């Protein structure tokens, strides 16, 4: 009797293989929903990434949605100038032109939240005049010594446009607007065959205890670090360096028992501000073991190695990207690369590669 496989056996084997492949495909379908957790210290750029996803994958902002950002942008702009003027008092920096004192009073008279369809003309004029004052400029250069919104310069430079009665926020205006995230916000979008549910959680220390609710079945963690903050102190604790806080937080996330099998993507963000700062604020002043001077590539390598070296699990790969979260073209490219990483991870976890 021959030892070859019978037709019936061959058909049975083929059926088994088809069933196994179908099970793998079903498993893959279950994994087509990607739960992505956005983590990072306060003001690292998490909310900006969410806004970019809306611009890139959801057709952007409607006119009504843009209108809704006006009051936030007005408030950000006025509040930023107020912060500088208060810092001038504590740093004992005088105005160059004493006539601008009138404009200082105009800014201080404004409420914390600016309401209305347009910025009052006297407020726009006050900010424009003060931004030209050499004393204000000197204080701005020392902004690492106090807590100033990243978008301050952008809005001050655009004040003439923002103060127009028919002003409508642009994509860039919206991206740079800042509202502190409290609680958990979710954004859903589709890239190819994958549905992403992206969760943004508050980055300030007081918000971190709420993260635990997001941890179950997380596919990927997108961890953001504002590398431009190497010379700044925490908003919540002005004895702690912001970069050191980010390193401590990344260590706890990367090596957490919750995330043993979770892929981690690290965005080293705000490279534009980082590049501007390096020549004027030596990194060695804050990280004494750094030897690269003002060299941008050397500084990037140093920071990258500081974060990646915290990973204690040999089998866990950290995927890294240097980013500028307000640059839509770059974020579109980077998120396409992230999508490819997640597809490969899915195939591997489902046993298809």
Swiss-Prot record:
The gene is fadA. This is Guanine nucleotide-binding protein subunit alpha. Residues 32-353 form the G-alpha domain. Residues 265-272 are annotated as: G4 motif. Guanine nucleotide-binding proteins (G proteins) are involved as modulators or transducers in various transmembrane signaling systems. Its cofactor is Mg(2+). Pfam families: G-alpha. A lipid is attached at residue 3 (S-palmitoyl cysteine). Residues 323-328 are annotated as: G5 motif. Mg(2+) binds at residues 47, 181. GO terms for biological process: conidium formation; G protein-coupled receptor signaling pathway; penicillin biosynthetic process; pheromone-dependent signal transduction involved in conjugation with cellular fusion; positive regulation of penicillin biosynthetic process; regulation of conidium formation; regulation of secondary metabolite biosynthetic process; regulation of sterigmatocystin biosynthetic process. InterPro entries: Fungi_Gprotein_alpha, Gprotein_alpha_su, GproteinA_insert, P-loop_NTPase. GO terms for molecular function: G protein-coupled receptor binding; G-protein beta/gamma-subunit complex binding; GTP binding; GTPase activity; guanyl nucleotide binding; metal ion binding. GTP binds at residues 43-48, 150, 175, 181, 203, 269-270, 272, 325. Residues 7-25 have a biased composition (Basic and acidic residues).
């Amino acid at each position: 009797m021959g030892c070859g496989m019978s037709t019936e056996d061959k058909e049975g084997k083929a059926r088994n293989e088809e069933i196994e492949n179908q099970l793998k495909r079903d498993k893959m379908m279950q994994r087509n929903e990607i739960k992505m957790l956005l983590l990072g210290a306060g003001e690292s750029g998490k909310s900006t990434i969410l806004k970019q996803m809306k611009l890139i994958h959801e057709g952007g902002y409607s006119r009504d949605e843009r209108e809704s950002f006006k009051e936030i942008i007005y408030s950000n702009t006025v509040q930023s100038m107020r912060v500088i003027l208060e810092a001038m008092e504590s740093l004992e920096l005088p105005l160059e032109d004493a006539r601008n004192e009138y404009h200082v009073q105009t800014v201080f008279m404004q409420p914390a939240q600016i309401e209305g369809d347009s910025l009052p003309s006297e407020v726009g004029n006050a900010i424009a005049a003060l931004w030209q004052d050499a004393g204000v400029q000197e204080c701005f250069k020392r902004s690492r010594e106090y807590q100033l919104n990243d978008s301050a310069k952008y809005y001050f430079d655009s004040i003439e446009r923002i103060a127009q009665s028919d002003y409508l926020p642009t994509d860039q205006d919206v991206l740079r607007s800042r509202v502190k995230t409290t609680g958990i916000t979710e954004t859903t979008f589709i890239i190819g065959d994958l549905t992403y549910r992206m969760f943004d959680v508050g980055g300030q220390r007081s918000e971190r205890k709420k993260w635990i609710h997001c941890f179950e079945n997380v596919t990927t963690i997108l961890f953001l670090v504002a590398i431009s903050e190497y010379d700044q102190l925490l908003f919540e604790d002005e004895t702690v360096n912001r970069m050191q806080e980010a390193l401590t937080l990344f260590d706890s996330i990367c090596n957490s028992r919750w995330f043993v099998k979770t892929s981690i993507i690290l965005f080293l963000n705000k490279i534009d501000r980082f590049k501007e700062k390096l020549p004027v604020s030596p990194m060695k002043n804050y990280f004494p073991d750094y030897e690269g001077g003002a060299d941008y590539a050397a500084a990037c390598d140093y920071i990258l190695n500081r974060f990646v070296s915290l990973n204690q699990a040999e089998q866990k790969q950290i995927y890294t990207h240097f980013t500028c979260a307000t640059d839509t073209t770059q974020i579109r490219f980077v998120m396409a690369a992230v999508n490819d990483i997640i597809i490969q991870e899915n195939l591997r976890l489902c046993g298809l590669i």
